[in-house]
Regions:
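N-terminal start-of-chain detector that recognizes signal peptides
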Residues: 10-15, 73
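A general structural motif
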Residues: 13-15, 36-38, 95-99
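Short acidic, Gly/Ser-rich segments with clustered Asp/Glu that frequently serve as metal-coordination loops
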Residues: 22-30
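Short, glycine/acidic-enriched capping/hinge loops at junctions between secondary-structure elements
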Residues: 29-32, 52-53
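Short boundary motifs at domain starts and secondary-structure transition points
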Residues: 5-12, 30-31
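Short, hydrophobic beta-strand segments that form beta-sheet elements in well-ordered domains
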Residues: 16-22, 38-46, 102
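Nuclease catalytic cores that cleave nucleic-acid phosphodiester bonds
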Residues: 45-173
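Charged, flexible boundary elements
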Residues: 1-7, 82
């Protein structure tokens, strides 16, 4: 009970929580995240340190490493179950005004989201069928225009960079 009260206090300023299914959409997270947004990046790869090193000290990103669970329970959809469990946990203490989004192409989340919407009709829960970068930049016309004009290979390469400086260095190296 005390932990729930502490979490309610801790999360009262959060307006949006994004749960990222990295197995499905990757590890790409924009450098700048709005101050009232919290990102839960679920990770199952035990050898991922290099890709996520920039996220470790970011107060807007919580890294949820489930690689130990994956070792113990070799079954399909482990990450999906962990994300839905965390979503259910979050619903117990976040404000009803807090928007919670799962970023994943996996439609399997839709049934869980529908069930939770019926159980908690005032909660704002949804799934975005793409990467967090696309979700976050969805309204940015310049970003969408540029990304729509590049091929899949280059798009994946651009989205793999977590820091604009490293992307600029890589592009300068190519030129």
């Amino acid at each position: 009970m005390l932990k729930r009260i502490i979490n309610k206090i801790k999360y009262h300023l959060i307006k949006e929580i994004v749960l990222v299914d990295s197995e499905n959409i990757g590890y790409q997270i924009p450098e700048e995240i709005p101050k009232h947004t919290l990102v839960y990046l679920f990770i199952s790869d035990p050898y991922i340190d290099e890709k996520i090193k920039d996220y470790k000290n970011n107060k807007h990103i919580k890294l949820i490493n489930i690689s130990n669970i994956r070792k113990e329970c070799v079954t399909k959809n482990i990450m999906d179950f962990c994300i839905v469990a965390e979503l259910t946990n979050l619903l117990s203490y976040v404000s009803k005004k807090t928007k919670i989004v799962i970023c994943s192409k996996d439609r399997g989340y839709d049934a869980s989201i529908l069930y939770l919407k019926e159980k908690y009709p005032k909660q704002l829960v949804s799934r975005h069928p793409g990467s967090f970068c696309y979700y976050y930049n969805e309204g940015n016309e310049d970003y969408l225009s540029i990304m729509s004009k590049i091929n899949d290979s280059l798009r994946k390469k651009v989205l793999s960079y977590t820091c604009m400086d490293s992307l600029k260095n890589a592009l300068n190296y190519l030129l």
